[in-house]
Amino acid sequence: MVKVAILGAAGGIGQPLSLLTKLNPNVDELALFDVVNVPGVGADLSHINSDSKTQSYLPKDKEDKTALAAALKGSDLVIIPAGVPRKPGMTRDDLFNINASIVQGLAEGIAANSPKAFVLVISNPVNSTVPIVAETLQAKGVYDPARLFGVTTLDIVRANTFISQLFLDQTKPSDFNINVVGGHSGETIVPLYSLGNSKQYYDILSEEQKKELIKRVQFGGDEVVQAKNGAGSATLSMAYAGYRLAESILAAVNGKTDIVECTFLNLDSSIKGASEARKLVKDLDFFSLPVQLGKNGITEVKYDILNQISDDEKKLLEVAIEQLQKNIEKGVSFAKK
């Protein structure tokens, strides 16, 4: 029996993510939690004739923790798209304070009710919210770094799509699986186009085209916000990306081997390759790298990729590391308040 809980299931990302998860044959039970509108989402999804059982959980009021506890109880995988999107006039700090509090509250619920679950964090800013979840679980004595994932998959999805769009006659987006390292916002996002099968195409681009491509991957979210006239952000593509990582983890749990995905993880020495990775990223506690997945989560960090990157990518990495340090510290200090 595999139970998946989605926290923030009625939101812009939560709804399509819940739909995709409902269709996964590896899922037996789907628990949908949100503070608004979730009974309707649950009723709607429950009519789909896939085999997973769907249940929605709505707290009676702000103080009610029983709904969250029931949603989480017995969950094997928890996905967190909860939070508020940035509204006009809202600073990044405003957004951070709201989402950080939401994520911390949910992490406390996980610690109490499903401490062994795999936890996938989508709520932005991921560079800070993942450290908050780590600190919260650690404070409760139930932290396993191999089971905590910051979802950066949208950066990989965009990196694959955007290079393919420059070579429409020769390639399809599915031809690529670009490794994207660093973090999950702006200049902390470093796509490694110089490696693997993207190299032959990337190398023939002009310097200007290369810069534009990197910038597009780093700031692709802005394109969607503009196209939606400020009325929303990247929700469908984000739901797909979050689902892709969840699907990979569920496949690994079911015994599929050789699954590698990039994720923003805690470079804890208990994970194979993490200590070596730290040395290459100025001793950062968290960083996004390709990892090998197994039945118990992350089995190995594929750090060697950082020794193979181009000089241009090394420069991008330096900028990313500097910003990441601040983002991580911000999350840690919030959690320790």
Curated annotation (Swiss-Prot):
Pfam families in UniProt: Ldh_1_C, Ldh_1_N
Enzyme Commission number: 1.1.1.37
GO molecular function: L-malate dehydrogenase (NAD+) activity; malate dehydrogenase activity
An example Gene Ontology CC term for this record: mitochondrion
Reactions catalysed according to its record: (S)-malate + NAD(+) = oxaloacetate + NADH + H(+)
Annotated positions binding NAD(+): 8-14, 34, 99, 122-124, 238
Group of enzyme by EC: oxidoreductase
One annotated GO biological process: malate metabolic process
Active site: 184
Subunit structure, as described in the record: Homodimer.
Miscellaneous remark of the record: Has antigenic properties. Elicits a specific immune response in systemic candidiasis human patients undergoing malignant hematological disorders.
Sequence similarity: Belongs to the LDH/MDH superfamily. MDH type 1 family.
Name used for this protein in its record: Malate dehydrogenase, cytoplasmic
